[in-house]
UniProtKB/Swiss-Prot annotation:
It catalyses: N(6)-(pyridoxal phosphate)-L-lysyl-[4-amino-5-hydroxymethyl-2-methylpyrimidine phosphate synthase] + L-histidyl-[4-amino-5-hydroxymethyl-2-methylpyrimidine phosphate synthase] + 2 Fe(3+) + 4 H2O = L-lysyl-[4-amino-5-hydroxymethyl-2-methylpyrimidine phosphate synthase] + (2S)-2-amino-5-hydroxy-4-oxopentanoyl-[4-amino-5-hydroxymethyl-2-methylpyrimidine phosphate synthase] + 4-amino-2-methyl-5-(phosphooxymethyl)pyrimidine + 3-oxopropanoate + 2 Fe(2+) + 2 H(+). Pfam families: NMT1. Pathway: Cofactor biosynthesis; thiamine diphosphate biosynthesis. The lineage of its organism: Eukaryota, Fungi, Dikarya, Basidiomycota, Pucciniomycotina. Pyridoxal 5'-phosphate binds at residues 115-118. Keywords: Iron, Metal-binding, Pyridoxal phosphate, Thiamine biosynthesis, Transferase. A motif (CCCFC) lies at residues 195-199. The keyword Transferase applies. Belongs to the NMT1/THI5 family. The gene is PIG1. Its EC number is 2.-.-.-. The modification N6-(pyridoxal phosphate)lysine is found at residue 62. One of its GO terms (biological process) is thiamine diphosphate biosynthetic process. This is 4-amino-5-hydroxymethyl-2-methylpyrimidine phosphate synthase.
Length: 341
């Protein structure tokens, strides 16, 4: 097996949900598998698919919709597994902004988004609510959606329930406002998708590198699976390990984000075919991929027993269960609630 380091480019700066990767490194799971790994963080998350697709990084993480779009644009990338499953994603706003649960209340508002596909999603939704893309102002915010809402440069922005929504809830608490002032219009519900899988965070690979390094790829997946297993077996100990190697993680905000991410984390790392079918069809609807596009994923390197996937009914039931779980964690705390700094 090659002793060269495998470069792994994250989809974002190190974030609580990246824990299995860093724990795999710090606990020696990569070394046990005979591989060396360099974990890299991007300056701009929009560059990740291009950097992996052009061979400047071997492996990495990216959302499902970006993985599909990157392949459609000619970058040879493929998903080899899942890090985080179906985090609730939507238009986040504050009570008093003039926005309500009616999508049409976004008319005349400034809506922030991370990358270009967020704007495409909102533009597409306007068609179903008697609006056009000219009825709102799109503002590209990159990693700073929450900050832009707080500063008032946007009225709402696309974000994740376990990341940007948490940032805003904690800001509200610090400013004598109830956390319930933070609201979300879930994109999957507005678009009638039946899942939030378009923002599932995947492990992706450069296809040329993948073809030449199947043993190293399998070793990487076994190691991050061991990292995930350690997290589920001992969340508090794993969080402490993560904070040891990434001291910036050791903040109250990050602990809450981890609590809110925990239920979304993939236990078996499988690419869920039901979700891929939905998001591939959704991407065709958005015009992100052509009609003859074939989903770019493989489960070849998930070499352990996995639970049956289930059909549409099981997927919808999972979403309802997750909604209940996340509401409980938001109100009562999660796996780290007793952990102190």
């Amino acid at each position: 097996m090659s002793t060269d380091k495998i470069s792994v480019l994250l989809n974002w700066h190190a974030t609580p949900y990246h824990l299995p990767i860093f724990v795999a490194q710090s606990k020696g799971f990569f070394a046990k598998e005979g591989i060396k790994v360099a974990i890299l963080e991007p300056n701009d998350p929009s560059d990740v698919t291009e950097l992996i697709g052009s061979g400047k990084a071997d492996l990495g993480c990216k959302a499902m919709i970006h993985t599909l779009a990157g392949k459609a644009r000619g970058f040879p990338i493929k998903s080899i597994g899942t890090l985080m499953d179906e985090p609730f994603t939507g238009v986040i706003y504050l009570e008093g902004s003039g926005i309500t649960s009616d999508f049409r209340s976004l008319k005349g508002k400034r809506i922030g988004y991370v990358g270009e596909f967020g704007k495409i999603q909102i533009d597409e939704l306007t068609k179903y609510y008697g609006m056009t893309s000219k009825d709102y102002t799109a503002v590209r915010c990159g990693m700073n959606v929450s900050k832009a809402i707080i500063e008032g440069t946007i009225d709402a922005g696309i974000g994740l329930e376990n990341i940007q929504q948490v940032e805003l809830e904690e800001w509200c608490k610090a400013n004598n406002r109830p956390a319930s002032d933070v609201k979300m219009l879930r994109i999957d519900e507005l678009a009638e998708l039946g899942c939030c899988c378009f923002c599932s965070i995947l492990y992706i690979a450069n296809e040329d590198w993948l073809k030449d390094h199947p043993k190293e790829t399998a070793a990487f997946m076994r190691a991050v699976k061991a990292g995930a297993d350690a997290m589920f077996a001992d969340p508090r100990g794993s969080w402490a390990e993560y904070c040891k190697v990434k001291p910036a993680m050791n903040t109250p905000l990050n602990r809450i984000m981890f609590d809110r991410s925990f239920n979304y984390m993939s236990q078996d790392l499988i690419n869920v075919s039901r979700d891929w079918n939905k998001v591939t069809n959704y991407s065709k609807r958005l015009g992100i991929v052509p009609e003859d596009f074939v989903s770019n994923y493989t489960n070849e390197f998930v070499q352990w027993e996995v639970a049956p996937e289930g059909g549409e009914a099981e997927g919808l039931a999972k979403q309802q269960e997750m909604k209940t779980l996340q509401a409980h964690v938001a109100e009562h705390g999660g796996v780290l609630q007793a952990v102190t700094a």
